[in-house]
UniProtKB/Swiss-Prot annotation:
Keywords: DNA recombination, DNA-binding, Transcription, Transcription regulation, Translation regulation. PROSITE patterns: HISTONE_LIKE. It comes from the Bacteria. This is Integration host factor subunit beta. HAMAP family: IHF_beta.
Length: 94
């Protein structure tokens, strides 16, 4: 599902909020999440999951095209840990 599909699904719920307002609220929420993560803050949405940054130390990698070794710098990467409710629902249709 892409953002526009998410906005449409929310609008279909007949909650008397315009599509533009739904889109604006969702974009604003995502922007604040990005800013919080960029500032090193953890985000927790109960039942859904949590977002945080994980540290990756520098290491020697390999360019898959050429096979040559390359140095990969240290960095932080976004990490998502699903909450219990999300994990349980994901396994309902097994």
């Amino acid at each position: 599902m892409i953002k526009s599909e998410l906005f449409e699904r929310i609008a279909e719920q007949k909650i008397n909020i315009s599509n533009k307002m739904i889109e604006r609220a969702a974009k604003e929420m995502l922007e604040h999440m990005i800013i919080s993560l960029a500032n090193g803050k953890r985000i927790e949405i109960r039942g859904f999951g949590s977002f945080s940054l994980h540290y990756r130390s520098s290491r020697i990698g390999r360019n898959p095209k050429t096979g040559k070794s390359v140095k990969l710098n240290e960095k932080y990467v976004p990490y998502f840990k699903p909450g219990k409710k999300l994990r349980d629902r994901a396994n309902i249709h097994k």
